[in-house]
Amino acid sequence: MIKLKQLIAATLLLSTAFGVHAERLKDIASISGVRANQLIGYGLVVGLNGTGDQTTQTPFTLQTFNNMLSQFGIKVPAGSGTVQLKNVAAVAVYADLPAFAKPGQTVDITVSSIGNSKSLRGGALLMTPMKGVDGNVYAIAQGNLVVGGFDAEGRDGSKITVNVPSSGRIPGGASVERSVPSGFNQGNTLTLNLNRSDFTTAKRIVDKINELLGPGVAQALDGGSVRVTAPLDPGQRVDYLSILENLEVDPGQTAAKVIINSRTGTIVIGQNVKVSPAAVTHGSLTVTITEDPIVSQPGALSGGQTAVVPRSRVNAQQELHPMFKFGPGTTLDEIVRAVNQVGAAPGDLMAILEALKQAGALQADLIVI
């Protein structure tokens, strides 16, 4: 206990000795094997106000409903395949099972329609087993849905939809029935996986841990992983990790990147982006073609015929922007200021950045998403 207190005190002293840009280890890395697991299930939502599946078009909904009734000893008469169930909808149920979740605990679930239900508002999910990728049942879901959207339709065909009424959530809607085995307490080492691979950050993590616990305790496996010696006793291992995850490490600077989303026009320029000496001018040419036909009317008693003579008018207009120059080592602020001065739109800025990259003047990775 005394050694643990001394270790905590040393941790606090080392944490305060670093700059304000340091980040906690838990914010930049995770423990290998300690993660959430995805669960999925298929079930029925009942109690809808006439907004359920049109079962004549979604036969799987009616089949699921009949199978459920048969489990309660209710036999559906033959030839009932055309029954319309307006208050029932087939849904997919999915959730993330947190690490170390134990039987009896609850997790939030999301419920989404997989048929043609218009809205799940006001519905209740019936008991639905939720399986993992191995096919085993890890949780049972059931409960009333919370739907943020709604759908309304008038008799004249007018319709209004707010948000997405065909999907909802049930807070604490699934009860955990089985734990996922974890290798957390196995072996005498643990592996820390960086959220973003960086050799500088990995080295700084190793240096910080070894400075606190002694040489050789931490070892970098590569730019994204650090192996740490850990106690074998589970209780001591938890105390040990509670200290490690609160260590503050100054992460390495990210590589210079420019991210472009061509669909939305969003452009993100990283802090370390620089431009080599270059001169840029950007203009746009607009060509407008209009049809203005002329009607030719012959004189009276001339024997001629009225004719339509086609006539096209072509107008070309080019917007000229002044040329601006980038000097050596131009930074992000100067790039943004220069582009704003010429009034370039996001689409124009994309073209400018792509041209600078092709010219070898943009000292950054250009990534289009």
From Swiss-Prot:
Alphabetized PANTHER family for the sequence: FLAGELLAR P-RING PERIPLASMIC PROTEIN FLGI (PTHR30381), FLAGELLAR P-RING PROTEIN (PTHR30381:SF0)
One protein family per Pfam: FlgI
NCBIfam families in the record: PRK05303.1
Gene Ontology CC: one annotated term: bacterial-type flagellum basal body, distal rod, P ring
Keywords: Bacterial flagellum, Periplasm, Signal
Signal peptide (UniProt feature, chain positions): 1-22
Sections of the chain in a coiled coil: none
Similarity annotation: Belongs to the FlgI family.
Subcellular location: Periplasm; Bacterial flagellum basal body
Functional description taken from the UniProt entry: Assembles around the rod to form the L-ring and probably protects the motor/basal body from shearing forces during rotation.
GO terms classed as biological process: bacterial-type flagellum-dependent cell motility
Disulfide topology: none
Protein name: Flagellar P-ring protein
Known partners and oligomeric status: The basal body constitutes a major portion of the flagellar organelle and consists of four rings (L,P,S, and M) mounted on a central rod.
GO molecular function, one term: structural molecule activity
